[in-house]
Amino acid sequence: MAPSVGILGERDQGQDVRTNNVTAVMAIANIVKSSLGPQGLDKMLVDDVGDVTITNDGATILRQLEVQHPAAKVIVELSQLQDKEVGDGTTSVVILAAELLKRANELIKNKVHPTSIITGFKIAAKEACTYIKEHLAISVEELGREALINAAKTSMSSKLIGPESNLFSQIVVDAVESVKMTNLMGDTKYPIKNVKIIKSHGQSTLQSQLIRGYVLQTQRCDQQMKTRIEKAKIALLDFNLNKFRLQMGIQILVNDPKNLEKIRFKECEILKERCKKIIEAGANVIITSAGMDDVATKYLVEAGVMGLRRVDKHDLRRLAKATGGTIVTTLATPEGDEVFEASYLGECAEVYEEAVGDNDCIFFKGTKRANCASIIIRGANEFMVDEVDRSLHDSLCVVKRTLESGYVVPGGGAVEIALSIKLEDFARTLGTKEQTAVAEFCEALNIIPKVLAANAAQDATELVSKLRALHAASQSSDDPAKKELKNCGLDLSLGKVRNNVKAGVLEPMVSKIKSLRFATEAAITILRIDDMIKLNPQNEELPQGRH
């Protein structure tokens, strides 16, 4: 440790800092390494209040960790970024970034300057992304809907729902396709936020289902209300339907006790008048984000209107978008009157209540404006339902990215090995100091297939060697039959090498490209650091006499 010069804290410099950073990053990568791939293992995480999470989703594992080391925090943020941008590949991006750092650190120990390594890594990442787009990408149009289902299955293969991937892949693809929309620029988008996920304990995961409509996990305000309404006109309110109360601070002087009853009566009359105006506008379903008292409920029952109260504002906004309704925050007009117009109402074909497990749910089908979908997840217990939810989120993101980018690549380590062989040849063409960095970059790419094979209890060295031989033959030959070998990847269940495009092991091209870019950028960010100053925490002394 270097002596501090007027600094109230610790200062580390040079190789000590780099070794320290690499050790911290490798520690994080080793936590998630065994969870990679279809044979990956799960992690049990217990937080400070004793809540248990069982998962093998890299982003979820790292989100639960309370990481102290600043370099390790960069890697945790890297997995969150991958989760946000792509939704899948969070584990592999962390493992790749850690391997790049480890190899870069070895080069620095051998007197290669960090700037040369950084330049080499940037060149290698750029060349790798170009090669994926030009040689490895396969158009979704060529493979059809089957490509989407296979991409979803590949995402699920490492998750708890892997054995039921035939059911869930169909659900996911149908859900994403049902929320298809075209924005103002004319681009086709698949906003998966419009896919509502409802979790309900009980029965098997095979009883999970897709609902082409919107589902709310709530029930009617009163059991006397209708359970089904056809041609629903929906009023969306962001205020309560309780008895009218005067504001705090207003005083009323009552001379006659009989007038107290008149005040109570008037309070109820104002509420009834509000309900009447909404119903006269044509509403037969009233949804509010606040309360609805017995007076309003009784009036709605008599009018044959379904009422829902305390609905989450997030759900209210989604319903407004789907049904074409307007969220009304007040009935008051600038003139001081109270008005509710028919144009505020949303529309859908039918609204009905149905029990799902122990919970009652309200279903909205045939929405007027935007398409929406809901997935009802069933499962034995809370842990299982939560893990299915996380798995479906990843798969929804994968299918969305596949549809929006229009390209997939073979999985099972095929891309990493192909890039490794390509970059080896590319490194030999460089006559600069960056050659060693590019060579180490292509060696680092081998970590993904090696970890995949090791987690599946296979001989990683033998399998990766076979795979490298096939990809080398593919890239060095003009024979169309040998060119097809570029799609070869690992078959982890049998411990063989196979054509993963024919086997249906596919991943979105965007996922691979962003993984490479993010991992390289994170490694470069940490590699640039050669000095770390950690200030001592300030001791705030309490004034005398206070404890």
From Swiss-Prot:
The keyword Protein biosynthesis does not apply. InterPro entries: Chap_CCT_alpha, Chaperone_TCP-1, Chaperonin_TCP-1_CS, Cpn60/GroEL/TCP-1, GroEL-like_apical_dom_sf, GROEL-like_equatorial_sf, TCP-1-like_intermed_sf, TCP-1_chaperonin. Keywords: ATP-binding, Chaperone, Cytoplasm, Nucleotide-binding. Its main location: cytoplasm. It is found in: Cytoplasm. GO terms for molecular function: ATP binding; ATP hydrolysis activity; ATP-dependent protein folding chaperone; unfolded protein binding. GO terms for cellular component: cytoplasm. It holds the Pfam family Cpn60_TCP1. Belongs to the TCP-1 chaperonin family. Heterooligomeric complex of about 850 to 900 kDa that forms two stacked rings, 12 to 16 nm in diameter. Molecular chaperone; assists the folding of proteins upon ATP hydrolysis. Known to play a role, in vitro, in the folding of actin and tubulin. This is T-complex protein 1 subunit alpha. It comes from Tetrahymena pyriformis.
